[in-house]
Amino acid sequence: MNGVLLAIGVLLPICLASGALLGYAAVRLRVQGDPVAERVNALLPQTQCGQCGYPGCKPYAEAIAAGDRINKCPPGGEATIQALADLLDLEPEPLDAAEETPPRVAYIREAECIGCTKCIQACPVDAIVGAARLMHTVIADECTGCDLCLEPCPVDCIEMREIAPDVRHWKWPPPSPRLIASDRERAA
């Protein structure tokens, strides 16, 4: 019993001193981040796909905070551009792509898959499941359509397919501005 009390008596001051030193170092050596970049990063989809020309969402957020354009994120689409424009008090710009493509997901032809796991390693959102030397499959609800899994596949068994409109992926066409204006005129 005396040995236990002796060990506690020796270790307790060491732990308290180490904790105080770590707490002081955390406050004194704190790295200040850009609050605008952090808020922009929170709005980006976090797919880390690189389609914007930056290696991930955080570097793109830092570039936006430094003055880069807000319309380079295809996975985020128009909704992200609008949210960024509202945050930064800018005019929303059209998406910087040839055309806005319909949402797509990866599809693995399982009969051709050799189970190399290269696509699993490339997927930034862990939407591909499988084990070594066994076929893999894609969780469509998790897939962001970033295309990063296509290139590493040695047997080209992955393809991108458009998401067919169904109950979960339906888009109503927006009403025409003239219709909205005429409704307001009648209400007034």
From Swiss-Prot:
Superkingdom field? Bacteria
- EC number(s) reported in the record: 7.-.-.-
What are the residue boundaries of the 4Fe-4S domain, all occurrences included? Answer: 32-90
Chain positions recorded as [4Fe-4S] cluster 1 binding sites: C49, C52, C57, C73
Subcellular location per UniProt equals: Cell inner membrane
According to the record, the segments passing through the membrane are none
Q: Which Pfam families match?
A: Fer4_21 (PF14697), FeS (PF04060)
Keyword Amino-acid biosynthesis assigned: no
What SUPFAM superfamilies does the record tag this protein with? 4Fe-4S ferredoxins
Q: What does the note under cofactor report?
A: Binds 3 [4Fe-4S] clusters.
Name its GO BP terms in alphabetical order. electron transport chain
Summarize where [4Fe-4S] cluster 2 binds, as residue positions.
C113, C116, C119, C153
Where does this protein chiefly localize? membrane
**Region Hydrophobic: start-end pairs:** 1-26
Write out the residues that bind [4Fe-4S] cluster 3: C123, C143, C146, C149
According to the entry, every stretch annotated as the 4Fe-4S ferredoxin-type domain falls at 104-133, 134-163
Instruction: Supply the alphabetized keyword list.
Output: 4Fe-4S, Cell inner membrane, Cell membrane, Electron transport, Iron, Iron-sulfur, Membrane, Metal-binding, Repeat, Translocase, Transport
State the GO CC annotations: plasma membrane
MF terms in GO: 4 iron, 4 sulfur cluster binding; electron transfer activity; metal ion binding
- List required co-factors: [4Fe-4S] cluster
* Role this protein plays: Part of a membrane-bound complex that couples electron transfer with translocation of ions across the membrane.
As for family, the record states: Belongs to the 4Fe4S bacterial-type ferredoxin family. RnfB subfamily.
Q: How does it assemble?
A: The complex is composed of six subunits: RnfA, RnfB, RnfC, RnfD, RnfE and RnfG.
| Protein name (record) | Ion-translocating oxidoreductase complex subunit B
Write down the species: Pseudomonas paraeruginosa (strain DSM 24068 / PA7)
Gene name linked to the record = rnfB
